[in-house]
Amino acid sequence: MARIASVNIPDSKRLVVSLTYIYGLGPTMAAEICNKAKISKDKKVKELTDQELISLRNIIESEYKVEGDLRREVTLNIKKKKDIRCYQGLRHIRKLPVRGQNTHSNARTRKGKAIAIAGKKKTVK
């Protein structure tokens, strides 16, 4: 397995697909990186030469925020919003959907498991 941006990428897959295993690189960015490195997108990772791997590493490390740096930036942005107590920050604090989604009947993933409410006590007539 080749190692790029401290991630082991699979050898048997095409280069474009393998690059998407790196956090922060989707299919579009992976194709863009292949074009910059002048490497065919359909080439398998195990067919790459050492020089091609080095050029891929250099392009990714110099031009893109990936893996730890990107995760750190995202968490710092969320923390900053929480600190200034803007609307999105408050939604993060309350563990509710941030981007305007409805919460009346949905948002179970974000809110957590449903909490049962005790039923009304039946009175004997």
Curated annotation (Swiss-Prot):
Provide a GO biological process annotation: translation
Cystine residue pairs: none
Please indicate if the UniProt record lists RNA-binding as a keyword: yes
**Alphabetical keyword list:** Ribonucleoprotein, Ribosomal protein, RNA-binding, rRNA-binding, tRNA-binding
What would you give as a GO molecular function for this chain, any one? tRNA binding
Listed InterPro entries? Rbsml_uS13_C, Ribosomal_uS13, Ribosomal_uS13-like_H2TH, Ribosomal_uS13_bac-type, Ribosomal_uS13_CS
GO cellular component assignments:
cytosol; small ribosomal subunit
Q: Which PROSITE patterns match?
A: RIBOSOMAL_S13_1, RIBOSOMAL_S13_2
How does this chain assemble? Answer: Part of the 30S ribosomal subunit. Forms a loose heterodimer with protein S19. Forms two bridges to the 50S subunit in the 70S ribosome.
What biological function has been recorded for the protein in this entry?
Located at the top of the head of the 30S subunit, it contacts several helices of the 16S rRNA. In the 70S ribosome it contacts the 23S rRNA (bridge B1a) and protein L5 of the 50S subunit (bridge B1b), connecting the 2 subunits; these bridges are implicated in subunit movement. Contacts the tRNAs in the A and P-sites.
Q: Which family does it belong to?
A: Belongs to the universal ribosomal protein uS13 family.
What name appears for this protein in its UniProt entry? Small ribosomal subunit protein uS13
Q: What is the lineage of its organism?
A: Bacteria, Pseudomonadati, Pseudomonadota, Alphaproteobacteria, Rickettsiales
